[in-house]
Amino acid sequence: MNTINDMQNRRDFLKTAAFAALGSGMAINSVLAGEGAAPALFNINKSGVTPKMKLRFFPYELRLRHVFTVAAYSRTTTPDVQVEIEYDGIIGYGEASMPPYLQHELGTMDSVLAFLKKVQDVIGQFSDPFRLEDILSYIDSLSAGDSAAKTAVDIALHDLVGKLLQAPWYKIWGLDKEKAPSTTFTIGIDTPDVVREKTKECAGQFNILKVKLGRDNDKEMIETIRSVTDLPIAIDANQGWKDKHYALDMIHWLKEKGIVMIEQPMPKEQLDDIAWVTGQSPLPVFADESVQRLKDIVGLKDV
């Protein structure tokens, strides 16, 4: 109970600090540190008129350095849309990425652009970017899907608010960046020579690797990477293992190779099989494709 109260008190304090910063023209960094003076934050009312938010978006094709292969698909490009939300001269940036094999869940380029046009037409009704929950709830209500487009707006809005407060979000949330989990670098399925090259490129820059599996060359992939580095490895099978006994055998073998976690070992429709694998696995098993929205988590109880 104390933890819940502490979290609520932290939220209340951060909210108060943010508005204190806005009212005084101080950055939230200075308010949190108790400083009495700081560079001007931004002018809420430059021209005597309350500013409105504006949204812009720019579709483009992201070209990859290497062919990127997962269990069911290979690609050399990714359809993308850059999203910008501007408020009083400050711009927050977001991105909608639509890998072809996930477009049923995330949306296509056409559907993303159509949804962002809807948002562009209505976002001006909000004059306060700090109403994050209200704005994002309203945008979510505009359609049942369009996850990629909604994510891009969410990211851009948070980026905007962080810039308005002149603070990164780990500070706004009261976190210690030194305690943040390490991010992974993903290595797609490929030939041994290419996998070896990719591993050499990234091994000195990251604390943990993420490796795509789910095809017949899974063991060759891991053996090749292990010939280059002994870094911890997270595995993402992208639903590629169809048989639960095969999946469990692979997980036991992977544990011997220093793998630390397994992501989405089997198709999301095979919930009973995934639950069986999770219950037997010597490594933690995480969902990926099985969770697109918060409501999906309920269906994964005990899985």
Indicate residue ranges for each PLM-predicted region.
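N-terminal export signals
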Residues: 5-6, 12-34
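N-terminal capping/lid subdomain adjacent to the active-site entrance of alpha/beta enzymes
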Residues: 36-234, 240-248, 252-256
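Catalytic beta/alpha-barrel core
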Residues: 188, 208-215, 238-239, 259-268, ...
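Acidic, glycine-rich loop-and-beta core segments that form the ion-binding/anion-interacting portion
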Residues: 238-279
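Catalytic alpha/beta core domains of metabolic enzymes, predominantly
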Residues: 269-274, 278-303
